[in-house]
Amino acid sequence: MQLVLASASPRRHELLSWLGVPFTIIVTDAEESDDPAPVEVVTALPSCPLPFREHPTLRAWRKAHAVWSQDQAPVVLGADTTVMLDGDVLGKPDDATHAQTMLTRLAGRTHTVYTGICVYNAPPRAVGVEASAATAPQLQLHLEASRVTLAPLDGNTIAAYVRTGEPLDKAGAYGIQGLGGQLVRQVEGSYTAVVGLPLPATWHMLSAAGITGMEDPTAAYRNWLHHQGKEPLPCPPTLP
């Protein structure tokens, strides 16, 4: 069954590939839209303390819906990640100075990373056949919350990390799977959700949508970590 990933993130591309299922990628900028979402989507959104427009599951739905509307692939997966600290949304930094400001706020503190997932399970409609309840897409929505604690960081350490360029395209201005992992002291919850795609939840949602033959998500997580040259964080044992 054909799977389309509605995301430009190379981290999500890589994580999904470790589940061993073939997929194609279609990218839109739909997550930035202000168009009202259907009532059935709004009422199905998981509870989240973020502002409505920033709700990661809503943004994931916008990505998946835009792709399905264009392509009507059998299964479309969308995801979006947002960082929150003290009630503030920390998205991707505008520039290096902004990244340094974000990391200064995060240093030595615990913040929450929210990753929303949307899966459309929609068989293509036959030519000339009107949409109906039988052909309407099945929709799955999910929100994963992980708590991340950064180590205390001095200005020189933050500046050196920002100079690598890694923080500039990442929510919260750090990449846990890259050099930014050295700044992390603890993860409570799904590690892969912090990267951008929680593998266990993704596996269950894709299975429900009819995708078969996937790698076990825990095995995929450990294989990915080994490929990265990493081990699970020991305190507490990090979940996939």
Annotate each predicted stretch with a short phrase:
Residues 22-36:
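A short beta-strand-loop structural module common to alpha/beta enzyme folds
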Residues 3-5, 25, 119, 148:
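Generic preference for hydrophobic
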Residues 21-24, 94-96:
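Glycine-rich, phosphate-binding/catalytic loops in enzymes
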